[in-house]
Amino acid sequence: GLLANDIEEVIVSSSLIDHAASEMPNPLHVMPGNDSANSASKTVGETLNDLLGVSSADYGSGVGQPIIRGMSGSRVKILDNGLVNRDVSGLGADHINDVDLSNVQQIEVVRGPSSLLYTNGTIGGIVNIVDNSIAQEDVQRLVKIGLETQSVNDGDSQSIFYQDNLNDINISFSYKDSSFGDFDVPNGSIIHIEEEHHEDHEDHDEQEEELGYLANSDFASESLKFGASKTGDWGFIGFSLANIESLYGIPYHGDEHDEHDEHEEEEEGHEEHEGERIFSTTDSDKFDLRGSLNINGNFLSSVDFFFRDSDYVLTEQHAEEDDEHDEHDEHEGHSKGPTTFANDTIEAGLIFDLSNDQLSQKVSLNFVDE
């Protein structure tokens, strides 16, 4: 057995006195919006991949979930302007984070247990994506046009952003359309795992050498967002409408799924899986109402309020290669039908600011119907 003197000694020390807040490691990192806007189209995970303690869990070009301190999925939550993004990315490694990074003011990352101060169930951390669709201060006219091309997948992306103050009403509009094909890869870089009893093993070796792309690595998305707000000494009030639609392939290897198909027509089934199209589509609509009223009373300083109505649908589908142009339709004759994840959420809340010169405190009331 293992003897006690064989175990390496670990000494843990702590201080009996409190450390100053400035001396403690800061778990919060704020990334300016320009850092993400000036780079190529990326997922949330890829955008934050260079931060300390943050990495990306890629599952094709469309999916890149952030990993914070080794934790991901439901332990890391994505927030949209302070509210939890109610997609289904936490239910599967191949589910996309349904967020729009085309018009980002800043990205806030909180690592570790400190994230519990902002939302529950996030021991890993949170990523808060902040935009200015509901402006809290008067804005000036700004126009941005973006164009992007990628040779590795014959892809392109176009975006436009406009904001202005018209008759004391702040308005903003953003639109982005991206389309990226399958990734080109060096010949022979994709290795096929063949079963020992396959008679045509040599034929497949020749085919893999001719393969020049990664099947089901494509990604396409279209996002649209409009917002308007009114500001003054009394506070602000505004609303925004957003829609995101996407289609992305899920890289797949047919042979790995054929090990359980021990029937007489194994070779025919294998050929069908080789040409199988695996992809997911998403469609989300979101309405936000947000505002703040300055009370400036002896007991109550201000009242913030918000309301969000969001509808999200993710559909996973299988299609044969010949029917690739009918990706949004049902495919007859296939043994596996589409799988749909849907989440309709209504969320509302009030935040009462009871702060004064000696004390800073707030009381929050939240309601969620999911």
Question: Which residues are covered by each model-predicted region?
Answer:
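Extracellular loop and loop/strand-boundary signature of outer-membrane beta-barrel proteins
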Residues: 92, 144-147, 157, 209-214, ...
